[in-house]
A protein has these predicted regions:
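A positional/architectural concept
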Residues: 2-42
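Conserved small/polar residues in nucleotide/adenosyl-binding loops
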Residues: 133-140
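Active-site rim/adjacent substrate-binding subdomains
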Residues: 26-29, 33-63, 70-77
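Acidic, proline/serine/threonine- and glycine-rich low-complexity intrinsically disordered segments
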Residues: 129-131
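Short, structured motif recognition centered on aromatic/hydrophobic residues
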Residues: 16-20, 92-96, 100, 121
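Short, solvent-exposed interaction modules
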Residues: 57, 63-94, 100
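A short beta-strand-loop micro-motif that forms or neighbors metal/cofactor-
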Residues: 7, 30-45, 102-127
């Protein structure tokens, strides 16, 4: 299974398009999607991105909670209702929906952050601050 690896920063053009890193596009296309699925992170100031097979895993996990459980309804509405399937143009660019851009505080650049089976999209300044905080926490744990 191919994974989303590394971090890239790409600029949003005047038409609102951003180029998805080619290595990320390759992983998404290997999973049968000429685009990506995105939704607001439920816990971070970022956008979660993934392939269709990851959404199927999420769906399976939610369904295991039972068809009428409150947990299922809450999680389904917070993930599936706010998800967008976004297709690549000929140059591998996408237009990220405005509500997702706003939820992540993205302005004119996007940090694409590989997370293994998924990836995140951040405002680069926000990601840098979060990344620095995580680095400091790891240093504290080592010593």
């Amino acid at each position: 299974m191919a994974l989303f690896l590394s971090t890239y920063i790409n600029r949003i053009d005047k038409k609102g398009r951003v180029s998805v890193p080619s290595s990320f596009r390759s992983v998404l296309e290997q999973n049968g999607l000429k685009g990506m699925i995105c939704y607001p992170s439920p816990t971070l100031e970022s956008i979660e991105g993934c392939a269709i097979n990851r959404m199927q895993k999420i769906s399976d996990a939610i369904e295991s909670a039972g068809p009428f459980s409150e947990e299922r309804n809450t999680f389904s509405s917070s993930i599936f209702a706010d998800s967008h399937q976004i297709h690549f143009d000929q140059e591998g660019r996408v237009i990220i929906p405005g509500e997702l851009i706003v939820s992540a505080g993205i302005i004119d650049q996007v940090s694409f952050v590989g997370m293994g089976e998924t990836f995140q999209m951040w405002n680069p300044t926000t990601y840098e601050a979060v990344s620095y905080t995580h680095l400091r926490a790891h240093e504290t744990l080592r010593y």
